[in-house]
């Protein structure tokens, strides 16, 4: 806590948001006075780990956690400490916590623990996953009645979008004040934004993140969703990460580009010395092909998630892989050997980034361990298949 305490004193922090991503990807925790945060260990009841998005608990509650609903010990990760830029009154900080059992072990059900276990497996093999997320979302008008359909908000022109505006700069600029504030918030929290894109839907946007450490990538998606919602609400609109918020508009995805580096050499193990594809590259893809069906609850965790998965709207409906082909579930973008990677297009924007990354890395790992073989790369429109 020494480095955290010094940082809190340097920035004259008065309040600390002590966060833990739950199983749904939402933030749970406590807001504590800085003085209390520095001197007291935070605890949370174990049952919080399995609270559903609607506030209820699993029918298997007593089989998953201790029946006494005992406390977990929450320990802050110093690497996630940052300012909360939307606190207007006094300087505030936020920090993501890891959950530990009373016996001192990382809690097995905490989503950061799940991802850490997968990354440990890779570390034992001398490999380091590199992940670059792409998250899509909609800006929508505020609506107090939950039974009414969501609608695009009014932009600077005084009217809502009514047509498809893929990659339109002017359509993005309709909400320029929102995104300027978003960029300010991202800078304050150290979020590595690579690009902002207008997607196919009305007021649908996409944010690309720089590639990097897998746990850091999950943290950034988790933090960004809070940032985007806060920036939107400051302008009296809302940002939704539902997979399919509007019936007649495309769904929102959370794509993950992934590659593997050798810890020893730092080189991409998906490419050999001649720049050609390696066997590991194909084993990894084959693992995703074999295990993705079983992992769909991590990629599509809600009923609404499956409304997104339909032909002709850039959502995958097959396990095919292909080169620069957006109709397949596993796309290999055009790149040089050093950037050879696989894009998993199955997850929706509503997926928990920690669990979705853990799932996709696990599938690839099993493919390599079992030396699975891929199908041939798909050529053409995969939606043409029945």
Walk through the language-model features, giving the residues of each.
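ATP/Mg2+-dependent ligation/transfer catalytic cores
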Residues: 1-193, 217, 355
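A short, glycine/Asx- and small/polar-enriched loop/turn
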Residues: 203-205, 250-256
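Short, conserved phosphate-binding/catalytic loop or strand-edge motifs used
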Residues: 135, 199-207
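Accessory "access/gating" subregions that flank catalytic or transport cores
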Residues: 166, 171-175, 179-193, 207-214, ...
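Short, hydrophobic beta-strand segments
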Residues: 95-101, 205-211, 258, 344
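Short, solvent-exposed loop/turn elements at beta->coil junctions and helix N-caps
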Residues: 243-248
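Short beta-strand elements
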Residues: 148-157, 254-262, 319-321, 328-334
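Catalytic-core signal marking the mid-to-C-terminal active-site face
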Residues: 230-231, 237-238, 263-386
